[in-house]
Amino acid sequence: MIKKNNNSNNNNNNPIIIKDGTNCFFKEIKDVLKFSRNWNLIILVSTIKLLLIPSYLSTDFEVHRNWLAITSSLPISKWYFENTSEWTLDYPPFFGWFEYFLSKFAYYIDSEMLVIDNLGYKSTSTILFQRFSVIISDSLFILSTLLLSNYIYNIIIKKNNNKNNNNNNNNNNNNNNNNNNNNNNNNNNNNNNNNNLHWYHDKSFIISSIIILNPGLLMVDHIHFQYNGFLKGILILSIYFLVRGNILIGSILFSVLLNFKHIYMYMAPAFFVYLLKYYCLKSNLNDNTTSKVNHSKQQQQQEFTIFGIKIFNLIKLGISVLSIFLISLGPFFYMGQIQQLISRLFPFGRGLSHAYWAPNFWSIYNFLDRVLLFNGLYKKIPFFKNFIIPDQVTGNLTSGLVGSETQSHILLPKITPQITLLITILFLIPSIYSILKSKSWKHFILGICQSSFTFFMFGWHVHEKAIIMITIPMGFLCLVNNKFSKLYFLLSTIGHYSLFPLLFQVEEIPTRILILVTYTLLVYLSFISSSSNNNNNNNNNNNNSNNNNSKQRKCSFSLGLYWFEKFYLFGIILLEIFNVFIHPVFLAHIERFSFISLMITSVYTSVGIIYCYLFTFKLIFKNEY
């Protein structure tokens, strides 16, 4: 266990490793906010967000203004029936109460924004209020990110210190007659321990910076306009408490999150299995990562179990989770409106894919359906040659509406919500098995990423913005193993580029390019720098030759990208040139090709994201982390 160093020179360099427990939570907050470079990071990201305030106003800006008006003007019994605007309230009740809370402040800024009939209202004060509400609520995301990355750092250092102590003890036992050699070895080990500690601390700050500066959040929240950062803050805080062993607090926070935005059901399988195994069944974590889960043998003997199930833990967990859902949904059960609420939250009639196809498996499926129609290509395939396709169906093959009431697949089999659910469950099995088989918190975080990834790949009516649900938690795994650095770099670059169609106005093109290019360079340089430092530390520990050192230094300045991965990333540059310069000039005015830019972007990024998805299976099956 590493205690706080009173030396003022080290206050900004070494984070504090403290004991687990709920009482330490506020102390940990105080500790992470002591470091000057954390404050520099907060100032930097806040400045960027302020500079983005004049950005264009998307339809989501009006969506949230309308929700402010609905929740402030109407009783809760009418929230999910109000339809003056097409942008009806379709988030769970807790988010409605969040909008209600914001409306109390909005009233003093500009009360006109709270009038339901003021559709499209966007006064300067309204714009500033809504923009600042996102920036301020992001504080939870920033704080929770610093807490979790610092705690993971503590786990790694604590584990390494235990290993080094064991090695020192073995050396002392084996070399009792060589006192001078022992002293030299101990001094070298201490120096190497300090080098490793500084390296992990530097990487901890790098990972925090990469997550907090996430370009997806900047584009979606602070330009397009949503509150994803605030919700990600609740998610990370939930993971933080679960990893440190405060199971009930972590489960309550995740239940709260589900009642803010139901899309986080994508992660529910991983949370459910983790809580079931490590809190309700006779199973404990390794790596000393938790304090509340790991009990003494005497405590375990006193626990009341049936068929290996810890009954009291199961009851406590059930009461904690169900009480949150009762608070959220109880009023709607009482008013007999639960069916109306469900119809708003799960509008299956919207179709398989969004108008701009999310870059997933169904994008490729949709594309194949359209390609077969192009110039009657399907007639050359024996299975389809007798199909009769109406002319009006082939009028605009690049339109994005798929699987809705107005347009479905034409040649390939129609996909229903039941089919997407079945495929999703099948592909969830490996990640669930990984959590059940493992004894480490690392598998839990990877399970969250994999569960979200699977729903993103095969879910019904997935939005492209959901890619952020994968990149944010995956960032923390980069602290664990460099293999995740490569995966994160690829997924981050491809996934965040797939968000470009959200910022479609000409004025936003330089902004979106600058954000992604700057971030991609930051990630690449940060990862190769931390990899270089790690290799140098390993070289010192192993006393390798100078030739080996130089070779490893050369290798360290690379993420190990294969030639085809580099070629694919270069293709993104060519695709953006086509989208910005070629399509608007030569193809946009032709109805047949008016949406081809969106189609190509979706399909091209789908290929890369599917590749990253398969990469996660490799990590799971080979246990390479």
Curated annotation (Swiss-Prot):
The enzyme's E.C. designation: 2.4.1.265
Any one of the GO CC terms: endoplasmic reticulum membrane
Pathway(s) of this molecule: Protein modification; protein glycosylation
One Pfam family recorded for the sequence: Alg6_Alg8
Keyword Ribosomal protein set for record: no
Transmembrane segments: 41-61, 132-152, 205-225, 234-254, 256-276, 314-334, 415-435, 453-473, 484-504, 509-529, 567-587, 595-615
Disulfide bonds: none
Gene Ontology MF annotations: dolichyl pyrophosphate Glc1Man9GlcNAc2 alpha-1,3-glucosyltransferase activity
BP terms from Gene Ontology: dolichol-linked oligosaccharide biosynthetic process; protein N-linked glycosylation
Compartments where located: Endoplasmic reticulum membrane
Region (Disordered): 163-194
Chief place of localization: endoplasmic reticulum
Organism superkingdom: Eukaryota
Assigned keywords, A-Z: Endoplasmic reticulum, Glycosyltransferase, Membrane, Transferase, Transmembrane, Transmembrane helix
Topological type in the membrane: Multi-pass membrane protein
Reactions mediated catalytically: an alpha-D-Glc-(1->3)-alpha-D-Man-(1->2)-alpha-D-Man-(1->2)-alpha-D-Man-(1->3)-[alpha-D-Man-(1->2)-alpha-D-Man-(1->3)-[alpha-D-Man-(1->2)-alpha-D-Man-(1->6)]-alpha-D-Man-(1->6)]-beta-D-Man-(1->4)-beta-D-GlcNAc-(1->4)-alpha-D-GlcNAc-diphospho-di-trans,poly-cis-dolichol + a di-trans,poly-cis-dolichyl beta-D-glucosyl phosphate = an alpha-D-Glc-(1->3)-alpha-D-Glc-(1->3)-alpha-D-Man-(1->2)-alpha-D-Man-(1->2)-alpha-D-Man-(1->3)-[alpha-D-Man-(1->2)-alpha-D-Man-(1->3)-[alpha-D-Man-(1->2)-alpha-D-Man-(1->6)]-alpha-D-Man-(1->6)]-beta-D-Man-(1->4)-beta-D-GlcNAc-(1->4)-alpha-D-GlcNAc-diphospho-di-trans,poly-cis-dolichol + a di-trans,poly-cis-dolichyl phosphate + H(+)
Free-text function comment from the UniProt entry: Dolichyl pyrophosphate Glc1Man9GlcNAc2 alpha-1,3-glucosyltransferase that operates in the biosynthetic pathway of dolichol-linked oligosaccharides, the glycan precursors employed in protein asparagine (N)-glycosylation. The assembly of dolichol-linked oligosaccharides begins on the cytosolic side of the endoplasmic reticulum membrane and finishes in its lumen. The sequential addition of sugars to dolichol pyrophosphate produces dolichol-linked oligosaccharides containing fourteen sugars, including two GlcNAcs, nine mannoses and three glucoses.
Family indicated by similarity: Belongs to the ALG6/ALG8 glucosyltransferase family.
Protein name: Dolichyl pyrophosphate Glc1Man9GlcNAc2 alpha-1,3-glucosyltransferase
Gene symbol of the encoding locus: alg8
